[in-house]
Amino acid sequence: MRKFIAIALVFTMALGLTACAGGGSDIHRLNMATGGDAGTYYAFGGVIASVLTNKIENVEVTAQTSGGSIDNARKLKNKEAEIAFMQNDVLQYAVTGTESMKDDGAMENLCAIASLYPEAVQLVATKSSGIKTIADLKGKKVCVGDQGSGSEVNASQIIAAAGMSYSDFDVQYLSFSEASTAMQNGTVDAAFATSALPNSAITELANYTDIVVVPIDGDIADNLIAQYPFYAKTTIGTDVYGVEAAETVAMMAVLTTTADLDEEVVYNITKTLFENQTDLIAGNAHGREVTLDTALQGVTVDFHPGAVKYYKEKGIM
């Protein structure tokens, strides 16, 4: 009987040692909050999650659907996710407890890992309207987005930076899909939309109506960025909608976490993100935009110490 107990104890200890030795350390299982299942955040988030899981030892990342940036901030705060996609203006509002996040209180524990790609503010007009500049909006019918939406906030800030106000034109509060229909029907001359490129509704509009992309550049862009530093300059290329290229401004999609996440884990996430671009591109076209040249762009909150460590190694901090 004693011999049986001794053998059982040895067997149990062996199992325990095997379990501990399996990967050399604990597995870090991380939930990544993204966006709706039809959106860019979820699609690209799934690619990033796969690359991080395959390339980093003892890290497993799972992309989860969510309601987008505001929801993701709350998920990080409530520890329902460890990393998340967020638009950089919402990240700023979340950390400071202002604007769209004022009812949630300041989430000072949130911090950035990296800027990923721009979400461009797109001002599109029908060619027949004759609109070529923001000043040309005066007296026209202009859709600024749903009232209180991100696009509408961006539109109001840009109009103010141009020294204008909504009283200068006939303002319409419509989603861009609704605005697209109205532009085809000739009841709206121009519309604002903030999204990743290309915007499917604009692509569809361009199939039915001759359009122009109106530049948001020069002093207007400079004034805007001086007041709202989470904006960044970008270009809508000719290849996007098949029309003349235009300079504009953009929010940045930012990979975000909290200060609680292990520094070495975040270091490895950051390193892997920027040193496996081929894998990112293979999974999603936005992988081309994940570069060290724009890693810090548009971020107005603190970066996680693990990300800072990597950026200092690469000489960009």
Task: State each model region's role.
Residues M1-L30:
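Short, low-complexity disordered leader/linker segments with a strong preference
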Residues N88-V90, T98-M101, S129, Y166-L255:
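Pocket-lining segment of extracytoplasmic ligand-binding domains
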Residues I27-K55, V59-E60, E119-N185, V301, ...:
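Bilobed "Venus flytrap"/periplasmic-binding protein-like clamshell domains
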Residues I27, I56-N58, G68, N78, ...:
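Extracytoplasmic
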Residues A43-L76, Y241-V243:
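Extracytoplasmic small-molecule ligand-binding "clamshell" domains
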Residues A81-Y117, N199:
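Acidic, polar ligand-binding/catalytic clefts
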Residues K140-Q157, Y228-T300:
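Ligand-binding clefts/hinges and TM-proximal coupling segments of bilobed small-molecule sensing domains
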Residues L174, E178-S180, Q184-N185, S195-P215, ...:
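An extracytoplasmic/periplasmic, membrane-proximal ligand-sensing/linker region
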